[in-house]
Amino acid sequence: RYTTSNAIHQGSKLPEAELPAFFDWLYDLEYGKMGLPRPDLVLYLDVDLPTSLKRMQHRQEKHNTKADIHEQDVAYLENCLRIGRLAAAHYGWTVVPFMKDGAERELEEKHEEIFSIIRSAL
């Protein structure tokens, strides 16, 4: 989880043309040189920005917390979504869309898709 998150958050600071080389370098560093265990499967849960913002607001209200410095920067979040999609394509992650026809998919539908992907990978 940390390497994949790192690819997105650190990658968001780079020009798009440099991303493929950065993605390759990061995986080589963390999985090759540092010897971290390489995941057998990565699921990228693709959520649009308005839904992501709504979920963050709900979490903040529910737990009486404030947005961190990154969560307050909507442009940064939007860029991370874009970089996440590029990273998913580069690395071959399995993308699970959380949206369908402009609305969030039902929980059961998302659950079934994720469970099916995991079951197939076992």
Label each region the model flagged.
Residues 50-122:
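NTP-dependent small-molecule kinase module
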Residues 3-82:
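A glycine- and Lys/Arg-enriched "phosphate-lid" helix/loop adjacent to the NTP-binding pocket
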